[in-house]
Amino acid sequence: MAVRKLKPTTPGQRHKIIGTFEEITASVPEKSLVYGKKSSGGRNNEGKMTMRYIGGGHRKVIRIVDFKRNKDGVPAVVKTIEYDPNRSARIALLYYADGEKRYIIAPNGLQVGATLMSGETAAPEIGNTLPLQNIPVGTVIHNIELRPGQGAALVRSAGNFAQLTSREGKYCVIKLPSGEVRQILSTCKATIGSVGNSDHGLERSGKAGRSRWQGRRPRNRGVVMNPVDHPMGGGEGRSSGGHPRSRKGLYAKGLKTRAPKKQSSKYIIERRKK
């Protein structure tokens, strides 16, 4: 997908860089694969704020995306490539040979009319999903499971990809987009190729209003708050706020937040890059 920069006819247009949407082939989603959901506005069931800077925004319809790809051996044809307001990637509508319809994350280079497969017998081609043990070493992959049958949990956002680097016994070694290198069971599934909409990172909103359309409210700095609201608040005049801290009082720069005795740490060969 390409991006376009608009002429600076207004202040909001001057810095705006948005996608061209040229790959989108349908504007109305498949009715059987969507449902409505009321926006929480960052409040919980008691009406209390649990997440700041969320509220407003355009109404969204949730698309049901298939992250399990468990219809093994049944071919599917790509019918449309669609926009999904709930994620950075595009989604593709699949028509299976037995009549079922499902949405998947659209990988880079996927075309309408292509035939996709999943399962151990599937070929390692773009959009096909198969166990890691059946994928050649060095292949670029996305939508990776952490547990067999759980559904894809890793590498799902626009433009991202991981690489299968080697095999060690019943595990495969995967290099993730963060730079982390970790072992994952060979029976876990992954999809061939990288996630589409790779130019998403180049987009710029151009104005505050576009952020509000997306449900993002202004984010205040802690140093301009009062002491009751933030550890860095208060002081006479413009003060530095002291050592950078989070709203809960934890050091904000360099403090490790991962649990030291986390069970999955033994599968991590190389920690992610900062």
From Swiss-Prot:
The keyword Ribosomal protein applies. Residues 195-274 are annotated as: Disordered. InterPro entries: NA-bd_OB-fold (IPR012340), Rib_uL2_dom2 (IPR014722), Ribosomal_uL2 (IPR002171), Ribosomal_uL2_bac/org-type (IPR005880), Ribosomal_uL2_C (IPR022669), Ribosomal_uL2_CS (IPR022671), Ribosomal_uL2_dom3 (IPR014726), Ribosomal_uL2_RNA-bd_dom (IPR022666). One of its GO terms (molecular function) is structural constituent of ribosome. SMART domains: Ribosomal_L2, Ribosomal_L2_C. It holds the Pfam family Ribosomal_L2. Keywords: Ribonucleoprotein, Ribosomal protein, RNA-binding, rRNA-binding. One of its GO terms (cellular component) is large ribosomal subunit. The keyword Transmembrane does not apply. Residues 207-220, 244-264 have a biased composition (Basic residues). It comes from the Bacteria. GO terms for biological process: cytoplasmic translation. One of the primary rRNA binding proteins. Required for association of the 30S and 50S subunits to form the 70S ribosome, for tRNA binding and peptide bond formation. It has been suggested to have peptidyltransferase activity; this is somewhat controversial. Makes several contacts with the 16S rRNA in the 70S ribosome. Belongs to the universal ribosomal protein uL2 family. Part of the 50S ribosomal subunit. Forms a bridge to the 30S subunit in the 70S ribosome. NCBIfam families: rplB_bact. HAMAP family: Ribosomal_uL2_B. This is Large ribosomal subunit protein uL2. It comes from Bacteroides thetaiotaomicron (strain ATCC 29148 / DSM 2079 / JCM 5827 / CCUG 10774 / NCTC 10582 / VPI-5482 / E50). The gene is rplB.
